[in-house]
Amino acid sequence: MQFKRGPITAACVLLALGNAALASSHREAPFITTSPKVDGTDFYMFRSYEGVASNGSGGRSDYVTMIANYQPLQAPYGGPNYFSMDPNALYEIHIDNVGDAKEHMSFQFRFNNKLNNVALPIGASSVAIPLIQAGGVSNVNDANLNLNESYTVKVVRGDRRKGAVSDVTKTDGSKTFEKPVDYIGAKTLGNASAYETYAQKHIFDIKIPGCPAGMDTGKVFVGQRQDGFAVNLGPVFDLVNAPAAFLLDPNNKDAVGQGGQAAVQKTNITTIALEVNKGCLTAGSETVIGGWTTASLRQARLLNGKPPSGHQASEKAGGAWVQVSRLGNPLVNELVIGLPDKDKFNASKPQDDGQFLTYVTNPTLPALLGITLANSATALAPTNLPRTDLATVFLTGITGVNKPANATPSEVLRLNTAISPVPFATQNRLGVAGEVLRVGGTAN
């Protein structure tokens, strides 16, 4: 499992892609803009392809990689506090392995921020420094770090709040995992290559209890990465301020990200990456799994007008967990769900997605694009309403590709674990839609 950034292109927001490998959602709902630390930006799920042969075997091919990204649009050199995760939040990756729109496995991540109280002798006094580092950093739990981030991982089987809970551990049995500090700059962490070497030290081999024999191993990493979602947010949200002919030409798919120079790709996110044996994720003979990520906050928050010394000590949080962010398929809450229901969608569960069906079957985006690109709501919008094709892509999966045998309509990212992985060099960035175009088909 490697975590080098590879751009994943949203080549054209006009296409609803049925690709079970990508998603995106940056600051998409009113409430989540007030809590960026729990704003889920992307969810990826795919068969691991590290070291696989051209026939899809070998290497890490028996594993599934799940990546949940949070905290969008992190500016480089965003100090002095940078982008630590929220210790008062619960970050989760959920798996439905029977097709009933309910989680049957959940991986829970909780974070702890340890202030080391680094101080310097200034005259006769020892005075705390104002930075999160006191010198160069190159190792796990480096002595020069004034703030150490760590996290725990638990696996829950069954309902996320009522199921059986077990600790995911390092291979030595320890339950605490370390997170690399965000990239501060070259003097603290060296150049890009040096930072990558430092970050790679925070990829840990893990043991997952309750998995079938020989399938209980995996890897985990949490840390800052360059945003891999390629889209020019400015032109897109400025009423798609680009020529329609350019946007609709599949030959321009690589230009959308400007070779990694699109505005969003000049920012960072915080990645939660987990690699698990596919045999641990599936149930019975069903090979299709559905995945999504959520973040939750405590129901009650008490602000302290006179906080004690410490780190993030201005609030006390308590009560039940309340889900405030949800992400599965690409761009659903960003471009499909109507503005009045965006917060509702973020708080909802897949099993209740019937309440949002009209947004999928009668989408407004094609009409908006017609207005902005051709001065007519009907100029570009398909007339095959209701859009059962979109319901298939987003809510049930595509037959023969990623549809479970007994599919309850729900918005989750689906992956058929029986389909072999493809080496990176021969992958199609547009997934199923890209393959249709490659063989001469047409997009609906």
Q: What positions do the PLM features span?
A:
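Gram-negative bacterial Sec-dependent N-terminal signal peptides
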Residues: 2-22
